[in-house]
Amino acid sequence: MAVQRFRQPRVAELVASKLRDDILSGRLKEGDVLPSQESLFGEFGVSPPALREAIHILETDGLISVRRGNVGGAVVHHPTAERTAHMISMVLQARAATPVDVSEALMHLEPICAGMCAAREDRMTEVVPYLENEIGIQTAQFDDISQYVPNARRFHETLVSRCGNEPMILLIGSLELIWSTHESAVWNGDEGSAPMVDKTRRAALRDHQRLLDAIRDGNAARAVRLAEGHLAAARRNTLAVGTAHTIEAKLIADLGARPDSRPLRNDRPQSSKGIAT
């Protein structure tokens, strides 16, 4: 009988695993700098090559970035929806997936999130204020065509982020971010033949308000139906303008640097009354 041999982890993998646990558990915060190499040598009792390999493993994981020069060091990064979306978008691009594929997935998945939002017992504090805030921003900036699509997309991203289920927030939220970058590129970039017309924008904003009303009332079935109808219309409008390309991962990579970027999980919003941003 053949003896099954188990591969022993290398020293570098053990060091990387310990540091990874420190990052994911929150013992090391976003933006923290890892201790100096001399300190890590002393803590783990490993050779310089093993420590460098451990740092490289964490860098490949996206959990640290190494700064060079006088202010150098290994800076900690916690996993985010944006980084997850970037990884998913790279896989989708490698498989030649298109915006049509992503939007079809969202047509099936986002209405589920809408229903979950409406079914939350704490929706009046954990869902409604966030969606009201987004609609307030949309309304205040309605005439600024360059801001309409990013603002509208954040309503959808917020809807998913408040559904109350962390795996769905991460996975569906990543698809939302991928679709958001495509839709913004279509309407605000070179691909669009014309800006979104006033009638279309008003209809979309009205749909958002109706969806919010259904969620506020706790009517999950109506929230699902409204989300399905709204997503179908939005998908038709966008895909009629731009469908030619596969998913572009570089658009997601640039997400954190865009001026209108906001985290997927919002802090508690202020009142949307009088918003002028």
Which ranges hold each PLM region?
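Short, conserved clusters of charged catalytic residues that mark active-site
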Residues: E59, A97, R154-F155, R206
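Conserved amphipathic alpha-helical segments that form helical-bundle/coiled-coil interaction surfaces
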Residues: V102, L106-G189, D207-R210, R222-R236
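Short helix-capping and inter-helix turn/linker motifs at the boundaries of alpha-helical repeat units
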Residues: R10, S146, R201-A203
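Hydrophobic/basic alpha-helical segments enriched in Actinobacteria
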Residues: R27, D32-S39, A94-T98, E121-V128, ...
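Short linear motifs at protein or domain termini
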Residues: M1-H108, I112-G115, A119, T246-E248, ...
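Surface-exposed charged/polar residues within alpha-helices that form helix-capping/stabilizing sites
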Residues: D21, S25, S39, A140, ...
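C-terminal all-alpha effector/ligand-binding and dimerization domain
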Residues: I178-T277
